[in-house]
Amino acid sequence: MRTPGHDVELAHGFLLTEAVITTPSHIRTARFCDSPETGTYQGNSVPDSPDMSRCRVAEPRQRSFNVLDVELAEGMPAPGVTAQRNFYTTSSCGVCGKASLEAVRLRTRFPPAGDPVTVTPATLAALPDMLRAAQRVFQATGGLHAAGLFTATGELLVVREDVGRHNAVDKVLGWALLNERIPAIGCVLMVSGRASFELVQKAVMAGIPMLAAVSAPSSLAVDLAVDAGLTLIGFLRGQTMNVYAGQHRIDRAASDHQSLCEPA
């Protein structure tokens, strides 16, 4: 399930975090199967000539824009037939500790551990309000998650909303990929919910050095953040936060309020 809109970004972000692509040039075309006239994305320099025989072309009144056909560039290996969201899960055990950490470690092309960026507690404390102010659909409905990508100085680069928080993050990362901001060096990913293992995995795959959430992280999310060298912040509310990993990126010297930032 996803909220319609920014679907090309969603596809790019999902394929990035599943280690299928690392640049926009790895995708030749992406178009809505049931709308041949509109909704086409063309790759950087490859003509748009998809094989529409695989797509059901609907009448105008039937177009739902719910199926996006993505064609990888020539020479790109196709994902396995069992590829699905969360490549580190299995039906028998779900997300499995050490195996999951190892899978992310082997797949990521942009490990964030070496990113020297630092962020002040005051900058971090301002992010939730900035994210909320940019959530237009949430303000109208109260029903969507959001993710936003910020610079280390607190500039909001992009925000995306979706009924699924994983989709919101994928849309943000797809935007970053299409705008040549992957790896997202020096950036902070802010999410409106909790920090799950899956969201930490997505941040790591995109080379993002800091992930902040308004709620708690899972224990496996903390383990992955420590293993990958990512700064993980939870319960970022008002003037308080918990830092679960990567405390060296919090510039406490720049703040007079040491109580802003408590190690977890």
Language-model regions, residue ranges each:
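General structural feature for long, well-ordered alpha-helical segments within catalytic domains
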Residues: 100, 123, 127-130, 143-146, ...
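Intrinsically disordered, low-complexity regions enriched in acidic/Ser/Thr/Pro/Gln residues
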Residues: 1-44, 48-51, 59-147, 151-152, ...
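Structural motif
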Residues: 67-69, 93-94, 146-148, 155-158, ...
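Glycine- and Gly-Pro-enriched alpha-helical subdomains that act as flexible
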Residues: 137-193, 200
